[in-house]
């Protein structure tokens, strides 16, 4: 289709969110033999360097009530599972890594979310480097390391979407405060794209008004706050740098635990991920009921 329209394939950007492991986790479907389809999809879209097709929908964990380090740790194991399976199937590591995209959720924990995205990019780059992706780009790519490693392949493409876990049914306009701060933290963290959930999604199909407000929330950050003009504005902040290291350490420990137990696919098939997230969900609801975790408009300033 793109070729018939005469588009420049090297400039087309987009994604196809193929995530069989996500469906296994959420729906319980056995799609463990996904590698044939995944490999074909990656190879078909190889001429589109900026088009991603393998997706890590970590937002499902966020919306189910996971903690921040949990979401990141499982997301890394999730992405590594796809990457290792593709490489084992004969796909070059650089191509496989460039076709993986991460969809994260954003909670209301402002500074921790900024740190989460910064830690995610750092850890994913470390994981991809272990596969030694080779840069075969012509002419010579300026992002090629001395040992031939393709640094472009090490860059994480992250989409962020405001969480539905903390959206409330009553006094729904307070949801606007939550989604605005969530979008702000993702923008400051330098994600590639953001989706703001309409404030009324908890009780009805979003209408034209709520969808327009959701779009305008992003435009405020771009056109009035100019968050798109600065690269990593949080860099150098001791507090955020310290949080980044802390979250990275916790997430990495979970990642290593999952890998030691056979990888993300085995963890999902055994129900370990689902059990851990359900336990976190229960713990967070208990924390809200006891006012250990603040939910504005519900247990604080109701």
Task: Mark where each language-model region is.
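Flexible, glycine/threonine-enriched loop-and-boundary segments that flank and lead into catalytic domains
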Residues: 163-172
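Catalytic-core signal marking the mid-to-C-terminal active-site face
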Residues: 212-302
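Catalytic alpha/beta active-site cores
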Residues: 1-109, 113, 134, 139-146, ...
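Extended amphipathic alpha-helical segments enriched in small hydrophobics
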Residues: 113-125, 217
């Amino acid at each position: 289709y793109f070729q018939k329209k005469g588009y420049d394939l090297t400039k087309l950007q987009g994604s196809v969110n193929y995530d069989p492991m996500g469906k296994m986790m959420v729906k319980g479907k056995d799609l463990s033999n996904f590698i044939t389809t995944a490999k074909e999809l990656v190879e078909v879209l190889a001429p589109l360097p900026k088009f991603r097709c393998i997706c890590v929908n970590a937002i499902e964990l966020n919306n189910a009530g996971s903690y921040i380090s949990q979401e990141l740790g499982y997301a890394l194991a999730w992405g590594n599972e796809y990457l290792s399976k593709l490489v084992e199937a004969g796909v070059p590591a650089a191509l496989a890594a460039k076709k993986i995209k991460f969809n994260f959720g954003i909670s209301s924990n402002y500074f921790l979310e900024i740190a989460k995205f910064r830690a995610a990019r750092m850890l994913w780059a470390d994981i991809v480097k272990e596969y030694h992706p080779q840069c075969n780009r012509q002419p010579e790519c300026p992002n090629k390391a001395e040992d031939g490693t393709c640094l472009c392949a090490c860059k994480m493409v992250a989409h962020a979407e405001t969480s539905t876990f903390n959206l409330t049914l009553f006094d729904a306009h307070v949801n606007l405060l939550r989604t605005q701060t969530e979008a702000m933290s993702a923008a400051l963290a330098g994600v590639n794209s953001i989706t703001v959930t309409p404030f009324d999604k908890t009780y009805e199909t979003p209408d034209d008004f709520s969808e327009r407000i959701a779009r305008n929330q992003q435009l405020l950050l771009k056109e009035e706050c100019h968050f798109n003009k600065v690269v990593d504005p949080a860099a150098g902040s001791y507090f955020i740098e310290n949080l980044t290291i802390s979250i990275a350490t916790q997430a990495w420990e979970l990642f290593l635990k999952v890998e030691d137990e056979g990888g993300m696919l085995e963890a999902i098939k055994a129900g370990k991920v689902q059990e851990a997230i359900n336990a976190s969900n229960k713990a967070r609801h208990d924390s809200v009921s006891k006012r250990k975790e603040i939910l504005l408009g519900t247990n604080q300033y109701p």
